[in-house]
Curated annotation (Swiss-Prot):
Family indicated by similarity: Belongs to the SNF2/RAD54 helicase family. RapA subfamily.
Residues that coordinate or bind ATP: D177, E178, V179, G180, L181, G182, K183, T184
Protein name: RNA polymerase-associated protein RapA
Segments forming domain Helicase C-terminal: 490-685
Taxonomic source organism: Salmonella choleraesuis (strain SC-B67)
Length: 968
């Protein structure tokens, strides 16, 4: 193309310079000035890497003065283009704009503009963009969005609760599973779904102080949710950044004590407009009709202001009826306002539970039983269902299941309370106790005597704590010169046990971090035993590395030495040997220790070893735990209640272990109390609630469906393709582990979610569960979601040129591959992507407008194409620009029909689903008062807004590829 002074061109290699103007030329060179940067470039005339910028009728352009022109006609005068059209700000027609007066800061965002301006992407980036659109659209439509990405075992009862609650508007529920069944994971799954769908954006978690780091770790490691931990120091710092410090973070964890201690702080918490509030250990909130505690009132204030509330608590039977009512009152004070009425109501659910038990038993029902069912579900004609359920027909079981479902809907608190028990959930191992009685060394005997004399004025509790850890007493007297590990028989026993079980992983827990550190040194120096240490003084990353080393099968640590606090929230199901080097002070901590191994997913029976020193508090406590509470070999829901009632007597025996008179009677009394309470709890079990919480067959199918999605080969191929194109280094470490590190030539300087020093990833759930340092990559992982956003929010891969070698077609034949996106704009909380996610529509048009996309599949076609360098590509585009423009206009005509069909289908699906959900809940409200008015109103409002947003849905061209046929 001939050059003329004043023409506008763009650099193929430096598009960031903007629009250039020819300011000088001679026989061999041409000089361009780029006004937006003030730079000049000198190019050879014969083969310069520049592209002429030419706009077409229908385009909108901007003048150097800032006003815009809609082009109606393009003229050429002396080699320069003159654009004629309508000025948008004044609506004046027949306005002319010479190309020399175009805005130099021109940004080409439309794919066709980028193509015509020579901004041509690599072919592999176009393919990645199309795949990203396709996979993103598919993922939005997947039925279990938000449940697939967490690093957890796929446990049916947990998935059932999370799936039910996570899809609700502003859920307000009580999670009351027995210990070890995963309430924290259930809460995390619910949060993950709500945050991923946009139903919630701001979350506050309030927990006891000792559990803050456990929650921080669990949310980050299992769900990739990065919470901020607020304490006094962080709160004071944040006051410099905002009037309300809590508005500086979206996801916050704080302790209950921190929340209630300061009136202004509580007001700030209440004013921070949270979407979800999570309260752990909610059974510690003391309430009575006359005198609710300050902690209870603080949470009550928050629960009144926050739409969604999750309370995690001990089982209702452990709490007692009044305490249980107090939790429900926090969730829905209008519904649960009268304790006496609540007690009466609970009694009335007994016939419902009995009816469900009859149906589940599978026996034929008597006339009386059929009549009772008819009375319980009186507002509907269920005669045909009753007949089917009581027959030998093939549909008998289906009829029974439907009747059970109808009865469940009428069950008082089943929508607000979820509770699973170990009896109702299979898959737990046995626990076997091995006690090892060891002599008390003379050094300890001396230290204890001296301590007794010096600490005569200490309280019984302080003396008891001292007596539990004699090594601490000895070390205090001896100082740095003390070496208790040289004579403590527990150390010798531990070394002997570990050397005789070299092939087995062993978890050792002791109360103090210093004990763990000293034991590690002794094991390493004396026996060369590989031991990892895990304590509260380590950072989360250091703990991860220690846990990962322990998890490695062949070259990993044989033993992990944990302190009491350091082990909180970490589970090591791959090990089944637990050594308690000392004993914790109360049964809750004992259960927490055993719970590190005793989880769902543990494949072996747990061997619990307790080496203890005679004539110390350890010998007293080991007997009380085992003989009085049976707390080693079985979970002990009665432990806290009995501990509280026996506390005064127990403390005295611990403080003076040599005084054994009456101790056998105490053990006997505690055992009787334990058996009585246990029987009482068993009798009070709410079978109906367990069935509802457990999910049964439906929950099993849910787990199976997600497990099948784990094996998605498309994800692995896409992720590796994404990392290649973004410029992330990948180092395969074997064992299904890959190390990702940033490179110097990435698409963006900082890839969101990729640490500076890199990270280890795996696509295998089992590997991720055993290797805490490896991130579990799914479609829901931030690395993949951020990668999709990075590609799709910019113009990466939106315009390219390829060659098709095909002798069946004439040389120079043109094809244009168009990728349109049909989408609707709406606030995230409407979750419009359930019905109409940004959906790609691919078209492959020839010169006559024939769409060949249905006959030519994308991946097959892509493999037949070869790339063109940018300079050659620009020349090709210039040569066929008019033809391409004509094909684009044909595409604009054809897309409307396909797009309208997608939008109409989405509207129909949304209307059916949301109207059906509303109708079901409205009908249910007649028989179950636990359906809240605000929930019904929210669903109705959501339905109207969704349909309105879908009415305004549209489409746009997202990417295009020009294909030229060649025979070479």
């Amino acid at each position: 193309m001939p050059f003329t002074l004043g023409q506008r061109w763009i650099s193929d290699t430096e598009s960031e310079l903007g629009l250039g103007t020819i300011v000088a030329m001679d026989a061999r060179t041409v000089t361009l000035l780029f006004p937006s940067t003030g730079e000049n470039r000198l190019y050879a005339r014969s083969d310069s890497p520049v592209t002429r910028v030419m706009f077409n009728p229908g385009d909108t352009i901007t003048s150097h003065e800032g006003w815009q022109l809609h082009i109606d006609e393009v003229k050429e005068e002396n080699g320069l283009l003159v654009y004629v059209g309508t000025r948008l700000d004044t609506e004046e027609t027949n306005v002319t704009l010479r190309e020399v007066l175009l805005d130099s800061k021109l940004v080409f965002s439309k794919p066709q503009d980028r193509l015509f301006a020579g901004q041509i992407d690599r072919m592999d980036r176009f393919a990645l963009r199309y795949r990203a659109r396709k996979f993103q659209s598919e993922q939005y439509r997947m039925p279990y969005s938000g449940l697939r990405g967490q690093r957890t075992n796929l446990i049916p009862h947990q998935l059932n609760i999370a799936h039910d609650v996570g899809r609700r508007h502003a859920p307000r529920v009580l999670l009351a599973d027995e210990v070890g069944l995963g309430k924290t994971i259930e809460a995390g799954m619910i949060l993950h779904q709500q945050l991923l769908s946009g139903a919630a954006e701001r979350v506050l978690i309030i927990v006891p102080e000792t559990l803050q780091h456990q929650w921080l770790v669990e949310m980050l490691r299992r769900f990739n949710l990065r919470f901020a931990l607020f304490d006094d120091e962080r709160y004071t710092e944040a006051q410099h950044d905002a009037y309300n410090p809590f508005e500086t973070e979206q996801l916050v964890i704080c302790s209950l004590d921190f929340a209630r201690r300061n009136k202004q702080r509580l007001e700030h918490l209440c004013d921070a407009e949270w979407d979800l509030l999570v309260v752990d250990e909610a059974h510690h909130l003391v309430w009575s009709t006359d005198a609710p505690s300050r902690e209870y009132m603080a949470i009550e204030q928050l629960a009144e202001r926050v739409p969604g509330v999750l309370l995690l608590t001990a089982t209702p039977e452990q709490l007692g009826m009044e305490s249980h009512f107090a939790r429900l009152r926090l969730l829905d004070p209008n519904r649960f306002h009268d304790f006496e009425q609540f007690v009466e109501e609970q009694k009335n659910y007994r016939p419902v539970a009995d009816a469900v038990a009859m149906l589940l038993a599978g026996n034929k029902l008597s006339n009386d039983e059929l009549n009772r069912l008819g009375d319980l579900i009186g507002e509907q004609d269920i005669e045909p269902l009753l007949q089917a359920a009581n027959s030998d027909r093939d549909d008998a079981q289906a009829a029974r299941d439907e009747l059970v479902s109808m009865l469940m809907d009428r069950h008082g608190t089943s929508r607000v309370l979820f509770r699973n028990t170990r009896n109702g959930v299979k898959g737990f191992p046995k626990r076997e106790l091995h006690t090892v009685k060891l002599p008390l060394p003379t050094q300890y005997q001396t230290a204890i005597k001296v301590s007794g004399i010096m600490g005569a004025r200490k309280s019984a509790e302080d003396r008891a704590r001292d007596m539990l850890y004699p090594e601490q007493i000895y070390q205090e007297f001896e100082g740095d010169t003390g070496t208790w590990w040289n004579f403590d028989p527990r150390v010798e026993w531990l070394m002997g046990y570990l050397t005789s079980h070299r092939s087995q992983k062993v978890l050792v827990i002791c109360a103090k971090a210093t004990t763990a550190l000293q034991l590690e040194q002794v094991l390493r120096e004396r026996e060369g035993i590989r031991a990892a240490v895990f304590h509260e003084g380590m950072s989360i990353i250091e703990r991860d590395r220690a846990a990962a080393w322990f998890a490695e099968e062949d070259t990993g640590a044989q033993v992990l030495l944990c302190s009491e606090i350091g082990s909180e929230g970490r589970n090591f199901q791959f090990a089944s040997n637990l050594v308690m080097f000392d004993l914790p002070f109360n049964p809750d901590l004992l259960e927490q220790r055993i719970g590190r191994l005793d989880r769902i997913g543990q494949a072996h029976d747990i061997q619990i070893h307790v080496p203890y020193l005679e004539k110390t508090a350890q010998s007293v406590l080991v007997r009380w735990y085992h003989e009085g509470l049976d707390a080693f070999e079985h979970t002990c829901p009665t432990g806290r209640a009995i501990y509280d009632s026996a506390y005064a007597s127990l403390i005295n025996y611990l403080a003076a272990p040599e005084e054994t008179d009456g101790f056998d009677d105490l053990i006997k009394s505690c055992r009787e109390q334990h058996e009585a309470l246990k029987a009482q709890l068993e009798q009070g079990r709410d079978r109906l609630l367990e069935i509802h919480s457990n999910g049964g067959e439906k929950a099993q199918q849910l787990a199976q469906s997600i497990e099948e999605q784990d094996d998605d080969t498309n994800l692995i191929a896409f992720a590796m393709n994404l990392f290649d194109i973004v410029g992330i280094n990948q180092d395969d470490r074997g064992d299904n582990l890959i190390v990702l590190t940033p490179s110097d030539h990435m698409l963006v300087p900082d890839f969101p979610g990729l640490p500076e020093d890199g990270c280890t990833i795996t696509f295998e759930r089992d590997v991720a569960l055993s290797r805490e340092d490896a991130q579990f990559i799914t479609w829901e992982h931030p690395l993949i979601r951020n990668g999709l956003d990075l590609i799709l929010s910019g113009d990466t891969g939106s315009s390219t040129i390829s060659l098709l070698k095909n002798k069946a077609l004439p040389v120079g034949t043109l094809l244009v591959e168009l990728v349109y996106v049909v989408e609707a704009q709406a606030p995230k909380q409407l979750q419009l992507n359930r019905f109409l996610p940004p959906t790609p529509v691919r078209m492959l048009l020839d010169k006559n407008g024939n769409n060949l996309a249905a006959q030519v599949e994308f991946e097959t076609f892509n493999r037949q194409l070869s790339a063109v360098n940018r300079h050659t590509g620009s020349k090709l585009v210039n040569a066929v620009q008019q033809d391409v423009h004509a094909i684009l206009q044909l595409g604009e005509t054809q897309i409307e029909k396909s797009a309208r069909a997608l939008i109409d289908n989405a509207r129909r699906e949304a209307d059916e689903k949301l109207s059906g959900e509303l109708s079901r809940l409205e009908a249910l409200r007649a028989v179950n008062p636990n359906i809240r008015d605000d929930e019904l109103a929210a669903i109705d409002s959501n339905r109207q807004q969704v349909l309105e947003s879908l009415n305004q849905a549209g489409w746009r061209l997202d990417a295009l590829r020009l294909i030229v046929v060649t025979h070479q």
